[in-house]
Amino acid sequence: MSECFQDGTATFLILGSICTRNCLYCHVAHGVPAPIDEEEAARLVFAVKSLSLKYVVITSVTRDDLPDGGSRAFARCIGTLSESLPDIKIEVLIPDFQGQVAAIEEVIAAKPAVINHNIEVAPSLYAQLRPQGNYETSLKILSRIGGTPSIISKSGFMIGFGENSADISRLLEDLAAAGCQAVTIGQYLQPTIDHWPVRKYYHPDEFTAIKKTALEMGFRHVEAGPLVRSSYHAALSGSGGA
């Protein structure tokens, strides 16, 4: 956390803290979310100003209860921040909006510097770990983002669930084919005894090898390591550095 603040970077969660999905690797609370806070964008601007931030990541829980999945809230936060603090770089980490094209277009139209949509896990594990998600839907979202030259397309996934090297290669190949420019790869850590068990702890050298492979595939920026998460060194992905 101190490393992020030192770089003037912070991540903000919008749309509440209750997720409408229940993925087996995630410790975010799930259930019935509260109504949208219409003042959230203004409060976000106040927080960013107060912290003197240079790079802001905006993410959310999944809100399948909302007709647009929360895309309007993302667009409003991006627009309000851009208008109030034009020198701030903005990255958003979005859910899948149930694949709604209009919702994805609304976020793209708001013109953040980076749009991240995490693919999360190997496709062979989706049915078990992400039963409410869809691998192909996520790839289509990333392809649409990747087709917008002014926006950096980013994704990420965790390993340690029981995938093999072929699964990891397929993930990287599919992300590259979708036009993804930046990727984060981290070790899955089991949040509680009730969550999916860790099947393998990868050695740092293995992460180094995966990063090398990803860079050779053409990704502009790759973060790979045991403790890497979506927002780690986010400002570097926004600049396109390796």
Each PLM stretch: what is its role?
Residues 16-18, 60, 118-121, 187-189, ...:
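Short, small-residue-rich loop/turn micro-motifs
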Residues 16, 51-53, 202:
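Glycine-centered secondary-structure boundary/capping sites
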Residues 17, 66-67, 127, 180, ...:
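Alpha-helical protein-protein interaction elements
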Residues 22, 66, 125, 193, ...:
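Glycine/Thr-rich phosphate-binding loops of Rossmann-like dinucleotide-binding domains
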Residues 1-35, 55, 230-233, 237-242:
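N-terminal [4Fe-4S]-dependent radical SAM core
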Residues 11, 27-43, 50-101, 108-142, ...:
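Core AdoMet radical
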Residues 19, 62-65, 97, 162, ...:
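Short, glycine/serine-rich, charged loops/turns that create anion-binding
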Residues 1-8, 42, 46, 76-87, ...:
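Auxiliary Fe-S-binding modules of radical SAM enzymes
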